[in-house]
Amino acid sequence: LERTGTVVGQLSGIGTVGAIAGTVLTGFVLVSRIPVTAILLGLGVLLVLAALPFAWSARRHPGALATVGVLAAGGLAVPWLPGGCDVETAYHCALLEEDPEREGGRLLVLDGLRHSYVDVDDPEHLEFAYVRAAAAAIDAAYAGDGALDAYFLGGGGLTLPRWLAETRPGTSSTVSEIDPGVVQIDQEELPLPDGADVEVRVEDARLGLGRMATDSVDLVVGDAFGGVSVPWHLTTEEALAEVDRALRPGGTYVVNLIDHGEMAFVRAEVRTLQQVFEHVVALGEPGTGARRVAGSSDPR
């Protein structure tokens, strides 16, 4: 009894260290390097192996052994059953669907959410209303069809970069996309128009933004999402100051946001943009959660 407290404390400490190590290894090593299906299969195999001693002890009960065998066989067959992903990337379950109503239409679905629609035969076709609104904001800021230097926070299917390349010949676009699996899908399944000057960098957009040269672009488009949320580190005043630094005088920042209800997040982000840009405008359709916010030092 005199050592009970010490023993319990040691066991608790060992358990805590194990829990922390397991969480770190799973979150930063396993999930980022090994497909989830492989992780689940590996865990299943380990559980089956751990159960073998108990199965051996229960060998006098054929019914129990048969049940265990059926369950184990069924579990091992699961990874080969049809799933919901074409590609399991480090960040997403990615699915590319063909549009039965448009021959060149492709829908990029990430984790069950529609992220990008691309018509590989017609880069000027913008299927989603929020993308059309962002394009309208760009055209309002830059009349005509003059070439632009643009930077994109987030890539997805590269819908707007290919639209700019088609509607404003000579436009140069740089894209920061964090998921190499999505970039691979773009390269293999969603080819860019011939002659499109689009450079895609596999990197966190916040880090990529910091690498952009001062006064180097006319347009910055924020289109990065984790699910339905904009990554928080792209919404701060510090990040927006970096956007302003990269923009040439009179340049424009257009960001896509999703919010509902009282639009507390959109209101907060508008206030944040107002700390950096002299002129800020918010656009959106009633009854939807999609909003576009544009900021610039130029009132146009």
For the regions a language model picked out, list residue spans one by one.
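Loop-to-transmembrane helix entry/capping segments in MFS-fold secondary transporters
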Residues: E2-L11
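Glycine/proline-centered helix-kink
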Residues: I14, A19-G27
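Residue-level recognition of pore/gate-forming positions within transmembrane alpha-helices
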Residues: A19, G44-V48
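Structural signal for membrane-spanning alpha-helices in multi-pass inner-membrane proteins
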Residues: T26, A51-A55
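A membrane-interface helix-boundary motif in multi-pass transporters
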Residues: L30-V45
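Basic, ligand-binding patches in group-transfer machinery
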Residues: F54-G112
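The AdoMet/dcAdoMet-binding core of the Class I SAM-like
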Residues: H125, R132-V254, G261-A264, V276
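Class I S-adenosyl-L-methionine
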Residues: A264, V270-R300
